[in-house]
Amino acid sequence: VKYQRDKKAAEALANTAPETTSEETTVPPEISKDTVPLSVFMRNEAVNGIDKDDLARAAEDAASAASQGDNAENANALPEYIVLNGVKTEAKKALAKIVAADVDDSYNSEAIKADAVAVYTYLKYRNTNFNVSGLNAAETVSDNILNAVSEVFGEYVVYNGQPAFTPTFKLSAGKTTSADVVFGNSFPYLKTVDSASDKNADGYKTEITLTSGELKELANKFDSSINLSGSAKDWVKVTKHDGAISTGVGYVETVNVGGKEISGYKFACELLENKIPSYCFAVSYTSSGDTFKITSYGSGFGVGMSLAGANKMAADGSTYAQILAKYYPGTNLS
């Protein structure tokens, strides 16, 4: 049923005091240890598959329910609890904790709702009976975020009748990119989408400078078989990108480093050790200083919904449904 609601749960939540007072929202929420941000979590599972421990726990839950004579009455039934990082937590509260680790209280409520729907959708997409471990979750949640999550709890994004894969990230390069460029997997609704307002956001452009010696040290640390010799200007060449910025600059699919081709992800995240925040970047060399300048645009993987773009759309009057329809084209809400 479209825009499904659990009225009793909503009433119970309305009568429950939020975990924090509004005054506490000025302090960044504490994040659980030994976890990763949502965007990294999604990327890892897109490339490596759903966490096996979570799948195993889901199978145990199903077996336990079957032994007690419980049937999975409805695949779309709203969960009462989410097992978040090993802790059984009331479902709305758990969802709000994940959202609060992804966006802060300054976000427009419609953008927060869009993020909440995207997160809930991903939890359904994983099909682990709402068991999730290793994911950043805030210890405290503001009234604003808790209320926004409550309003859309149970809604999710569907494609061909099934929960969609709904990655989010902080800030695009002015456009999002296709999933196959960064993740290596293709989804019909994760294609390039214009997000031009992101170009005006704080942190849009980042530049770092490395000497040839520093780059060589990083490359050798990443892979000792990489041979950086001869003219330094030929050491690093972007070999494939999507042209998000221009014909010469975009989200990078492959880079040639010392004759060895690696993915843009491995170059930015592993070789450069996350010194740049985006996978949309350009590399240039200056012989006079024997230095490499690496310029990146945006922040995050660039696939799916730009949270900065969503916030700008919300500020301009768009609803969460309109935001989701833009960043996941061809999908619907259920």
Task: Name these PLM-found stretches.
Residues 1-334:
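Conserved, single-site charged/polar hotspot
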